[in-house]
Amino acid sequence: MIMFLTLDDFNFEDKRVVLRVDINCPIDPNTGEILDDKRIREIKSTITELINKGAKVVILAHQSRPGKKDFTTLKNHAKVLSDVIGKEVEYIDEVIGSTAREAIINMKCGDVILLENVRFYSEEVLSDWKKWENITPKKQAETNLIKRLAPLFDYFVNDAFAAAHRAQPSLVGFSYYMPMIAGRLMEREVGVLSKVLENPEKPCVYVLGGAKADDSIRVMKNVLENGTADKVLTSGIVANIFLVAMGYDLGVNMDIIENLGLKSQIEIAKELLNKFEDKIVVPVDVALNINEERVEADLNKDEKVEHLINDIGEKTIELYSEIINEAKTIVANGPAGVFEKEAFAKGTEELLKAIANSKGFSVIGGGHLSAAAELFGIADKIDHVSTGGGATLDFLAGEKLPVIEMLKESYKKYKGQ
């Protein structure tokens, strides 16, 4: 069980709180309009609670990264956030300058400020922060960003679960100077994911698809070796890799595996099949893309697949839906096919419907599958839609997440004080 400090552990009255969130949103590159404000809505409970407890809240966040078209200011984020929490959020177009510092010093209880995109500062995007030997509060605390801001605050609340697999200064550096506390979103994410990883109600089924097959296979390896998953249902590129490992000739689909740099995953799939063949389920049929039309085709080891596989087939949908229906816990990540094309959305939509209608506890990962759930109007029927993409996958793969590790360290240091 992961232990960390929460908002219940401190008195925030008249205290300055630096709140790190992940409100990285899809943005129209031409207009700058925020296309989906889900991540902004998800942090409402933490901000509202801090306001109600009399805190002075200063928010740090990022949008995209240098070189991307959606790498922009947080001005529009402040407007949307103001609407979401029903209170004006003051936007300041700098992070550590005199204007920002003066505004922070002069805050009143209940005030909320959103500072500029922290990734405008080179310290925040150094590749070194991905290396474990550099991930220490002291090292991050030595950055200019943290040294300038930390003296202004009493507490550091981290609600940026979607960035928990990162180790930038703004995510972990403040913990060298003050308690690092989990926000309500962070608390909920870690609680739910810990439950489905460490103590799921059985039978537990993992449904893994999408194009990020290496990430999904890391998750599969962890949940099978730990006895977490009773069945793993594969689809997308993940399924293709396992089909190749089983001796199927997927023709042009093998080219895609190679082009994505995933050929090495075939050997890993073979090893997993040797150990857990009875728990790994692969498609029995697929939907081929022939001149942009959906053509159902059974899989046969004696026949080469001559066209692109864009979805699982109807027999597989029925098979997977039956297994999902019997499950007490379902964890899904990645779409079953190219759901953006209407002809090949069936697998993803039907599996999501099966998950939503199941009586089991359901969790789906962020990214493409959560977007699909929104598209098909199913998201509100899922017990937990994670805000994390890479962070969720790393967590389920049993890897250390820098933000979570620092929350644990802060608990040891400050609990009971």
Swiss-Prot record:
It holds the Pfam family PGK. GO terms for cellular component: cytosol. It is an enzyme of class 2 (transferase). It is found in: Cytoplasm. Disulfide bonds: none annotated. ATP binds at E340, G366, G367, H368, L369. Transmembrane segments: none annotated. Keywords: ATP-binding, Cytoplasm, Glycolysis, Kinase, Nucleotide-binding, Transferase. The keyword Transferase applies. Pathway: Carbohydrate degradation; glycolysis; pyruvate from D-glyceraldehyde 3-phosphate: step 2/5. Substrate binds at D22, I23, N24, R39, H62, Q63, S64, R65, R119, R166. Its EC number is 2.7.2.3. InterPro entries: Phosphoglycerate_kinase, Phosphoglycerate_kinase_CS, Phosphoglycerate_kinase_N, Phosphoglycerate_kinase_sf. One of its GO terms (molecular function) is ATP binding. It catalyses: (2R)-3-phosphoglycerate + ATP = (2R)-3-phospho-glyceroyl phosphate + ADP. It comes from the Archaea. Coiled coil: none annotated. GO terms for biological process: gluconeogenesis; glycolytic process. The keyword ATP-binding applies. Gene3D superfamilies: Phosphoglycerate kinase, N-terminal domain. Belongs to the phosphoglycerate kinase family. PANTHER family: PHOSPHOGLYCERATE KINASE, PHOSPHOGLYCERATE KINASE 1, CHLOROPLASTIC-RELATED. Homodimer. This is Phosphoglycerate kinase. It comes from Methanocaldococcus jannaschii (strain ATCC 43067 / DSM 2661 / JAL-1 / JCM 10045 / NBRC 100440).
